[in-house]
Every structure is written in C-alpha cells, then in structure tokens.
Design a protein with these regions (language model features):
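Conserved small/polar residues in nucleotide/adenosyl-binding loops
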Residues: 269-274
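Conserved helix-loop functional segments at active or binding sites
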Residues: 143, 186-189, 193, 222-226, ...
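Conserved short-loop catalytic and cofactor-binding motifs
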Residues: 168, 230, 244
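A helix-coil-helix interface module used to build multimeric assemblies
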Residues: 1-197, 203-206, 211-217
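Fold-independent oxyanion-binding glycine-rich loops
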Residues: 202, 207, 232-233, 266
Length: 274
C-alpha cells in the first residue's frame, strides 16, 4: 500500500512483518460501525447520494456477517490492516463507490476510534463480570456459618502465613468486595476518558469537509467528540490507563487464587486432611 516510493518490490519477510491484520482483525466490528457513522456523515454533507449510502451500509453489513459466519474469510494475506481489509472488500462488493467512503477520513482517526470502541466494550464486559463476581461473594458472606455452607462462621486471619486473630469468614470475603469495587470504580473512571469520538479529526489537523462530528459521536454511543484533533489522533493514554486498571484487577484476582490454594492445603487446615 505504501510502496509508491520504492523502486523494487518489498522483501517478502518485511512485507509479512509489517502487516498488522492478523492482530487488528479483532477490531473489525468497530471498524465497520465507525465506517457506517462516517458514511452517514458523508451523505449528510452531500458527498454521498442516498443510493450510494445504502450500497455502502449494506456492503458493510455483508462484510460483518461473513466474518462472523466464516472465520476463514479473515485469512487474507494481502490485507495490510483492518482498514485495508474493509476497503478491499467494499471495492469487491460495490466497486468504485466503496472507495468514496474514505473521503474526508484518515487512518489515524480510524484506528483511534476503533481502539476507543474496543476498550469501551472491554470495560463494559468486565464491569458486568465484576458485578456478578461481587454478587456471588456477597451471597457466600451471607451464608457463612450455615449448616449447608462450606465456610465456617469464624476463621483465623493470617499475617506472614501465621495465625494472627480470629475473624468472621464473612469479614474475609467482604475484604474482596472492597477490592473489586475499587477495580470497578477505576474502570468506570477510565471509561469517561475513553468515551470520546475522534471521527472528524482527519490525519492530524481536522477534516477538510463539513462533517457533523456530534452526530457521528452520538451514533457510536460516545459522550462527545474529542476536543483537539492532534491529541485525538496521536495519544493512546486511555489504553495505558485501561491496562493499568487491568493490572490491579489481575493482582486482586491473583491474591484470591493464592488464598484459595493456601486454604486448601494441609498446612492451614489440618482437620480437612485427616
């Protein structure tokens, strides 16, 4: 794709190395959604006719359905990245009309938008899982000590793997509720900064067309458009912030798993090993 300045073909190994589609194909649903929003904005701006918009939207839907039903459809050795893949498939389905979709749009804003949509969906999925996990812990805490419960009413609390003080089993469980509530809070706070729409930012200095950024943001469920095009297309701090929140969540899950292992050993509960 970027070979116009080269005087000889790229080395096959380099060409394979610089392809990101085997990795970023997971962004395809978000690329298609963002492309639909951009197509609607182009039609509103008078760049696309209503017939062309219908063609593009239908073709984007066809691409998504085929990708879901036939995973081998994504095994395209010629696709450089997810943007190139969609552009190539559009051209195959509707010809020159497919290329018009890229009018007034840059790959810089495309990947920034795709990543924000991906991170936002990941946050929402995790929030639901954390809520279910907290609910399960609370249910166990309420029944600790009951005859049907595997948990005793009281248990030793340990410091440095030595019995320190007696505590209610529910107290130990509720400690994890606090940890996971903080994890959920961090993810919710991160989501506020994720949920801004870069579409309309162009490569770096904004779009040359009059595109309705508010409408594109609303269509994709964003709170608002991003405020600065240079920032929107060049910064990925939201992704780092998300990974940081994940690292703390993973730490708490690891702590839980470690304690489950310890509490299952003869070292801590000899009565269960008799």
């Amino acid at each position: 794709m970027w070979s116009g300045r080269f005087r000889q073909p790229l080395d096959p190994e380099f060409e394979k190395w610089q392809r990101s589609f085997p990795y970023d194909q997971r962004l395809l649903p978000f690329e298609l959604a963002a492309s639909r929003a951009h197509a609607n904005a182009l039609e509103h701006a008078g760049v696309l006719s209503s017939e062309e918009l219908s063609e593009i939207v239908k073709a984007l839907g066809d691409i998504g359905r085929r990708a879901e039903s036939s995973p081998e459809f994504l095994n395209d050795p010629e696709a450089e990245d997810v943007h190139h893949f969609v552009e190539k498939q559009l051209a195959a389905l509707i010809g020159a009309t497919g290329y018009k979709l890229h009018t007034g749009r840059s790959r810089n804003e495309q990947i920034a938008t795709d990543l924000r949509l991906f991170v936002r969906e990941s946050i929402d999925t995790l929030q639901n899982l954390i809520a279910d996990w907290i609910e399960a812990i609370l249910a166990r805490a309420e029944t600790a000590g009951d005859s049907a419960s595997v948990l005793p009413l009281a248990m030793p609390a340990y410091t440095h793997l030595q019995p320190a003080e007696p505590v209610l089993a529910a107290h130990w469980l509720l400690a994890y509720v606090e940890m996971f509530l903080r994890d959920a809070s961090r993810l919710a706070d991160c989501r506020k900064r994720v949920n801004l729409c870069p579409l309309g930012s162009g490569a770096v200095a904004g779009a040359t067309l009059t595109l309705n950024r508010q409408a594109m943001a609303a269509e994709l469920g964003f709170d608002a458009p991003t405020a600065n095009s240079m920032d929107a297309t060049s910064d990925r701090d939201f992704a780092i912030e998300f990974v940081d929140a994940l690292s703390l969540l993973a730490l708490h899950l690891s702590r839980w798993a470690e304690e489950m292992i310890l509490f299952s050993t003869c070292l801590l509960y000899t009565s269960r090993c008799v």
